[in-house]
Each structure stands twice: as C-alpha cells, then as structure tokens.
Amino acid sequence: MDYLVCLSLHARFAEIELDGAAPLATQLERKQAALTDLAERSRAVLARGNARWSRASAHLLGQSLYEFGDALLALEAPPSLSGDDALAYLEVLEDQAWQLYSRGESTWSELVRLAPSGDEDPDNWVSITKTELWPRIARRFLHLPELDYPLVQAEAPPWGS
C-alpha cells in the first residue's frame, strides 16, 4: 500500500513542470516539496523491511532525483540575462542538477549493493536499476578529456628467446 502512495506522489512530482509559466523559484519549491514527500514515504517503505517493495521504492526515488536533475538541465536562461550572467545562471542550475544526479546515483548504487548475490529479484528492480545506472555513471565522465599514452617500443626480455 505504501508503494502505491509512492507512485501517486511520483505522479504529483512529475506533473510539476519547470517551464517558466510561473516564477522558477515557486516551481522549484513545489517540485522540491513533492520530492521530499516522496522521499519520506520511500523511507517508510524501507523501514517496513519488505525487500520487494523496498527495491521498488528505492528505484522510484532514484528515478525521481534523476528526473529533477534532467528538468534543471533542460532550463534555459531567462531572456533578461545575457553573456556572462546567462552562463552563470546556467552553471548554477547545472551544479544543482549534478547534486541531484549524485543523490540518485547513491540511491541506486545502494539498492544494487544491498541486493544479495543470487537473491531472487522477482520484479527485476535490481536488474532494471543496474541497466539504468551504468549509463548514468558513464555520463559523468563524458566531459573528461582522453589522455594520450606514449607508445614505447617493447623489447623482448633476454631470457624469453
């Protein structure tokens, strides 16, 4: 029953769009409050100790954190800002998005870590989470430059001939 409440809270959370129709601060407060409600209910599900619903709830919470981060990254700077001001605005949003991604990653990593090996996963929450988590983790490293490694001619050791 608690998980069904989590699903309805997630639906309410997802309905709150960051679209600029209302002041962004108001939209952010509403979305953050909805996320907090979802997190509290998810903690209640986890406290019950039922592995099946705990996994489902943890996955949903991690998904919500990622969705919030995605919504922040999709925002554009207000037309009243230009140049460095617009870049600074977008940088703040990006920093907040990466914090949400980090929390989502921690939630999902914990879900995967706590799943005992060989454990039955009847609803596939662990495998679903792994499938979605690994590409997310890889995205963190896309902006890092590739390192060039010098190539050195290898010589056969004297005892190898």
What kind of region is each of these model predictions?
Residues 1-161:
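Acidic, polar-rich low-complexity tracts and alpha-helical solenoid repeat scaffolds
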